[in-house]
């Protein structure tokens, strides 16, 4: 049963994030069922959205990102990415991947950061660089930045706002309204 769950999770989805979202949700549902059946609801093992995105990331880091809420929310606030990710095991994968894709795009444009990243392949600590994943898509680096920024308080000295839930909702509504108005304007200009 567990092997089949992982096979389904790792099945190619062609990059369709809606399909991937459904695969994650199905995996979590089956995992919760097994936990209730064999462990009577005692959670000895990680059984959440973070752990499942971790499995996907370890399986294929070039096409997946790890989601760790405590680190992601703080990072998103710092870069003023206020779109709604959802909560708990109901994370909106498409929104989270959009933020990560924007981060990767900015990282790839920074020559100094790319030079520093490529220096990790220089064998100075007794590890064969050929054993490293090349991280051509920079998804590993993206999570390193998100995780380390929060873990090591690299936000120190940066002024940023951590909006409350209602403020976030209002920002999201304003953004959606602005996008709607822009689309209406573009349609009107085409006529």
What are these regions (language model features)?
Residues 1-45, 61-191:
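An N-terminal alpha-helical hairpin/helix-loop-helix interaction module that forms a charged
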Residues 52-56:
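Cytochrome P450 catalytic-core helices
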